[in-house]
Amino acid sequence: KENKRIVTEKNMGPLIKTQMTRCIHCTRCVRFATEIAGVPELGAIGRGEDMQITTYLEQSMQSELSANVVDLCPVGALTSKPYVFEARPWELKKTETIDVMDAVGSNIRVDTYDWEVKRVLPIINENINEEWISDKTRYACDGLLQQRLDTPFIKYNKKFEKASWNEVYKIIKSKFEHTQKEKICGFVGDLTNMETSFIFKEFLERTIGTKKYDFRPTKSFINNSKRENYLFNSTINGIEEADLILLIGTNPRFEAT
């Protein structure tokens, strides 16, 4: 009678859950870590049926793209730890959108169950993110459920108190009515997508009658009189064909994700 092959689970950090008995040693995850993520922390030890995929020192993968191995694994040996037992795929509503967590604009699919975002997956776009997304893009949705402001607050006597949406809308309307339009300006945050920014711009121009709006954080300035000041001289896909890239005071690995 043949012995049953059992492999102990590996510790790959808070994002990747392992069930290594399922592993068929295809080494997709190993090749991704080395060739795509540029972090050769995954590898195979042992020979034959004793071969195991591991991080060598039993530690978390130190990569901003580590969770992509979940999508690559063909047998479910590597799965998403935060998503475990959350929902079944056929129960989820799938919405295609664009990531706003960084300036890359990765194409993503948001899977929701009722009003909760359960997971974020990449959509293939060879010109931008190919088929990968960063861990921040994939797991930032965790913050949408916990420690999130979902009720408006109004400041009374230097203290914030809960209020209804109708109360807030009435106060906003009153402020607009009693303020000269020349003194009204609008700002959008760093995580606002293009569609929302456009609607905000249309609201200010058509409803309020002002063209004073901006998106830049404090102490930043962009002279938009010339297109080259805010448009890169190459597409993301074209970077691979560049003869020379000069970076000054920046590290795209950490700052672009």
Predicted segments, located by residue:
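Catalytic alpha/large subunits of respiratory electron-transfer oxidoreductases
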Residues: 19-20, 25-26, 30-31, 37, ...
